[in-house]
Swiss-Prot record:
Any single GO BP term: mannitol catabolic process
Official protein name in the record: Mannitol-1-phosphate 5-dehydrogenase
Keywords noted in UniProt: NAD, Oxidoreductase
Native source organism of the sequence: Lactococcus lactis subsp. cremoris (strain SK11)
GO cellular component: cytosol
Catalytic function, reaction form: D-mannitol 1-phosphate + NAD(+) = beta-D-fructose 6-phosphate + NADH + H(+)
Keyword Oxidoreductase applies: yes
Pfam families: Mannitol_dh, Mannitol_dh_C
Length: 388
């Protein structure tokens, strides 16, 4: 039986990646530091996924094992050495922390003279996630290790899309997900061409698809979350019923379509993107998905990053002379967002009260364009004054 190692036994790992790998006949080794989850996986070797729709459905995922990388790192290294594929869904900020372990797994494959090619795929909400991980892994490799990596280890970028709300169940492993799911892998970066995963779309150029997803789903979800928080809503579904919040979402979508059509006219049409964006609205409005605003709005500093879901579109729309007023408006709401249980929100509010505003904008967004910085400064002040 083919073996898969998956880092991250959280909701996306179990509720999406694990489902696809299991359907493709893989024995799956989940790697995580959550002892309770890992122990449960090793006791039951299976779990159920619930599909949150008008016609509820349960899917069984089996052939599973768990490895606690905090307690048993050597077992992770051995699992990577024996694996046919390695995947990850742990969050962009955590990727650097597993790089050394992945490097040791690659070194063990080299020591055992394994000449079977393998792909290591980061399934994260970021552009170039696998390439980013590869650079971090390379920091722990010798020159000869790097030659082996170049010949036998692929790091194809990927885009994943499925809404998995925050949830708690008596069954530790049970997870509820929306019906929609999409996993796209950059075929041009794949090393192991001996199999293709059913349920995965392969593209020769991933960039247009990952930008469509990040600038539509992630930017859109965040638009609803920060707009809902500003209006005092706690649940995404409730916020979306407010006409101003729906209007904000549609405004961001309109600007996103303009950018995608300007960048990728050979991949998308206005009609395609309109249909895609209408589908996204219906996904956010799924009455069976009760998603908390705080989950979607968490880590506001990260979401204000230079290559993230608002600042990157703003930069690229500005370069093309296209409107980005709706994106800019949400940036103002992100700076106004307050959640005492979110360390980044607390940190951002502290900096707003102590730092020069333009300097703070430069620090958080990485921007140097004075025009955009000034526009962000004005919209921050607008929401600061409105909240008084």
């Amino acid at each position: 039986m083919k073996k898969a190692v998956h880092f991250g036994a959280g909701n996306i790992g179990r509720g999406f990646i694990g489902e696809i790998l299991s359907k493709n006949g893989f024995e799956i080794y989940f790697v995580d530091t959550n002892k309770a989850i890992i122990d449960e996986l090793n006791t039951r070797h299976s779990y159920e996924i619930g599909i949150a729709s008008s016609s509820p459905e349960k899917i069984s995922v089996s052939g599973l094992f768990g490895i606690n990388n905090g307690e048993n790192p050597e077992d992770v290294i051995e699992a990577i050495a024996q694996a046919d594929i390695v995947t990850k869904a742990i969050g962009p900020n955590i990727l650097p922390y597993i790089a050394e372990l992945v490097a040791k797994g690659i070194q063990k494959r080299k020591e055992e003279n394994k000449q079977v090619q393998i792909d290591i795929i980061a399934c994260e909400n970021m552009i170039g996630g696998s390439e980013f991980l590869e650079k971090k892994v390379a920091e722990y490799l010798s020159d000869s290790d790097k030659v082996y990596l170049a010949n036998y280890i692929g790091f194809p970028n990927a885009a994943v899309d499925r809404i998995v709300p925050g949830q708690k169940h008596e069954d530790l492993l049970y997870v509820e997900v929306e019906p929609f799911c999409e996993w796209v892998i950059d075929e041009s970066q794949i090393k192991n061409k001996s199999f293709k995963l059913e349920g995965v779309h392969y593209a020769n150029n991933l960039e247009p698809f990952i930008e469509r997803k990040l600038f539509s789903v992630n930017s859109g979800h965040a638009t609803v979350a920060y707009s809902s928080a500003y209006k005092g809503y706690k649940i995404i579904l409730e916020g979306l019923q407010h006409k101003e919040i729906l209007s904000a979402l549609k405004g961001v979508q309109k600007e996103t379509r303009a950018l995608l059509l300007a960048k990728w006219p050979q991949y998308f049409t206005e009609e395609d993107l309109m249909s895609y964006h209408q589908m996204i609205i219906s996904r956010f409005a799924n009455p069976k998905i009760i998603d908390e605003v705080t989950r979607v709005a968490r880590t506001p500093i990260r979401k204000l990053g230079y290559d993230e879901r608002f600042i990157r579109p703003i930069r690229e729309l500005n370069e093309r002379g296209l409107s980005y007023q709706n994106h800019l408006d949400i940036v103002g709401k992100i700076f106004a967002y307050q959640d005492e249980n979110d360390s980044q929100s607390v940190q951002l509010q502290e900096k707003l009260s102590t730092m020069d505003l333009q300097r703070l904008i430069e620090e958080v967004t990485g921007l140097s364009n004075k025009k955009i910085i000034l526009e962000i400064e004005l919209v921050i002040k607008k929401y600061k004054n409105d909240s008084k």
